[in-house]
Amino acid sequence: HERRFHRRTFGDQADDLTRVAVDTLRTRGVARLTRWRVRVTLHRRAGTSATPRLRSVGAMASRLPGGNPPTTRTTMRGQRDITVPRRSQMIHRGHYPQWGGGGEAWCSPTSTTMVLGHWGRGPRPRAYRWVGRRHRNPAVDYAARSTFDYGYHGAGNWAFNVAYANRYRTSSFVTRLRSLREAERFIRRGIPLVASINFGPGELDGAPISSTAGHLLVIRGFTANGRVIANDPAARRNSGVRRVYKRGQFADAWVGGSGGLVYVIRPQGRALPARTPEANW
């Protein structure tokens, strides 16, 4: 359906109180929201009877913390490392410029593809027969095409990525976690997370890139002393994707950087961690 319909957001939209930035509504100045409502409007081509199918609607509200959070102590009593396929976004550099051109532009669809691969989900090979024969991991190219935002001109739209994951019998959504302790609860349930981070030079030891204003990777586990085990798609090769990051540095890059934003992607019926007061899932 990508040939017939180009999914898109509509750029910056603003009034005196709020501003829409791609997939996020932000308040302006001192304005604060006390309640909100979501409306979905479905359209069909005039003169046809075909209609869209709406499977789920998701929205999430949050007030971002100021500055870097204090480092939380780990709750892990031993190492837990979930087996997640390793996929590098960089081996796709130069692929399909009309969908972002691979490389550094494809961290989100690459991370989404890794988690879908963990669950044994994703497109069947015939769906990506159009991908060049010499291209490794063609499901990543397919995911980039299927998540590309023709308004934003990128494949990193959070909502589009979880909507893509939901094609494959998953219950997926975007939320924010408050700390690595909450992420540990998902890992103990066997649920890897796609996390949004940003950091400056020297702020994340062992990262395959020196800095980033916005990047997505997979949290696949924790060491016994609380360090973060990640699949970082910015590695040059698939073999270098698995990384282990210092707990405090990662928390600053994730909670301090994006407010703890994650994609939660898991099969339908897979239980989430038990909810706590003010739960965010």
Question: PLM features: what roles do these ranges have?
Answer:
Residues 1-23:
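Extended, solvent-exposed segments with strong compositional bias
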Residues 24-27, 206:
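Catalytic micro-motifs at enzyme active sites that drive phosphoryl/nucleotidyl and oxygen chemistry
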Residues 2, 9-11, 30-82, 222-281:
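Noncatalytic regulatory segments and standalone regulatory/sensor domains
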Residues 27, 96-99, 165, 235-236:
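A generic signature of intrinsically disordered, low-complexity regions enriched in glycine/proline
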Residues 29, 35-154, 280-281:
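Active-site-adjacent structural segments surrounding the nucleophilic cysteine of cysteine proteases
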Residues 130-281:
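Conserved active-site-adjacent core of cysteine acyl-enzyme catalytic domains
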